[in-house]
Amino acid sequence: MKRHEMVAKHLVMFYYFAQHLWPEQNIRDSFQKVTLRRYRKCGYENLQLRKGCKSVVECKQHKGDYSGLNQCLKTTLSKIFQCNKYVEVFHKISNSNRHKMRHTENKHFKCKECRKTFCMLSHLTQHKRIQTRVNFYKCEAYGRAFNWSSTLNKHKRIHTGEKPYKCKECGKAFNQTSHLIRHKRIHTEEKPYKCEECGKAFNQSSTLTTHNIIHTGEIPYKCEKCVRAFNQASKLTEHKLIHTGEKRYECEECGKAFNRSSKLTEHKYIHTGEKLYKCEECGKAFNQSSTLTTHKRIHSGEKPYKCEECGKAFKQFSNLTDHKKIHTGEKPYKCEECGKAFNQLSNLTRHKVIHTGEKPYKCGECGKAFNQSSALNTHKIIHTGENPHKCRESGKVFHLSSKLSTCKKIHTGEKLYKCEECGKAFNRSSTLIGHKRIHTGEKPYKCEECGKAFNQSSTLTTHKIIHTEEKQYKCDECGKAST
């Protein structure tokens, strides 16, 4: 049988479909380059139809819309619509038409609220739902609502723990296909998203978007409660949970709850001990790729985040945000117990332990307990003897990068932290905080034995020796001991 080709613009059904679906926008989609191949005689009036339909014109079903006409056509017919830009084949004219629109700059569907335009009606509908926050699909477990049933189904996997998508390389499972695709790039080292500004490549488009803000300096998402700003909408949403105190994600192992699913996932590694991300430079392993990326900057010395006020650079964006508060004097985090304010949430959390006396972090080696996880990590190095941070100036080695930074300031003489009261400058923010207590008269460290209070924890430690009558310092010459 001879094969004929027919240019789609000659088909009445195409013109009818476009005119019927979008009459207001007056869309006349061009089909001259789209070819429809068939094995019978060309001409729309001779299309093979189902029983009872003599011609397209007489067919009653197609008068409603295009889908009706499509039902009339025999499914065995070869209907191939090829996109000109990419070699993609479609078995439905609607799919071909929808796909082609993505390559054009014509966006005929406009949102009346924000004036944003879209090339497809479905995209506009989706956009409107987000704007009006019409959440049709609700989670029965926590009451959280979603715009789409597919999003609800994905969300439900958080509660059920279902992870149907497994990595063939390492066996790790995920609850979403997108997460598996993203994970696979760890093994392939593929980085398809490249920054046009500096050439740096990333394995996620979201990471590139976040990175671009380094160059623009844009922080568009602002918290109404504490005026803190973020470069990502997701980070603002996460931050808001601090104010509400809501913690939806609970660890089945120990019962600890978190306000983010990612934090729960991160926490679970404490129980499993799993560390997938290894540093090629020193062999140290991490449970998060982002932590590995930050760690690598210790070796490279890269500090991409620079303060416009004083020129100081940082390895992490969060460190720059915290640093800026030194210049602005902003202290959004206040202690409900004593009214003291802080420029960082972590500092407030650390401060609260003074009132509670809680020490949840215990060393598995010697049993010593700490009020901060960072303090426990620092302590653990006593047992391992690890000192990865070396000062090039003095040759001194440190187990913490912060200690190395302090050492470097001794050589440079740099003193960034200045007291507004007397003008005295310091090379560490913690020293400035301790110094300020001289002016305020604050003494947060109290002796349980006699009730005497001190402005520094080290002074309290020294004072406690009086009660224990411990003679720590002995003279080698005469043997006399003193406190």
From Swiss-Prot:
It is found in: Nucleus. Its main location: nucleus. InterPro entries: Znf_C2H2_sf, Znf_C2H2_type. One of its GO terms (molecular function) is DNA-binding transcription factor activity. SUPFAM superfamilies: beta-beta-alpha zinc fingers (SSF57667). A zinc finger (C2H2-type) spans 109-131, 137-159, 165-187, 193-215, 221-243, 249-271, 277-299, 305-327, 333-355, 361-383, 389-411, 417-439, 445-467. GO terms for biological process: regulation of DNA-templated transcription. Keywords: DNA-binding, Metal-binding, Nucleus, Repeat, Transcription, Transcription regulation, Zinc, Zinc-finger. SMART domains: ZnF_C2H2 (SM00355). One of its GO terms (cellular component) is nucleus. It holds the Pfam family zf-C2H2. Gene3D superfamilies: Classic Zinc Finger (3.30.160.60). Transmembrane segments: none annotated. May be involved in transcriptional regulation. Belongs to the krueppel C2H2-type zinc-finger protein family. PANTHER family: ZFP14 ZINC FINGER PROTEIN-RELATED, ZINC FINGER AND BTB DOMAIN-CONTAINING. This is Zinc finger protein 117.
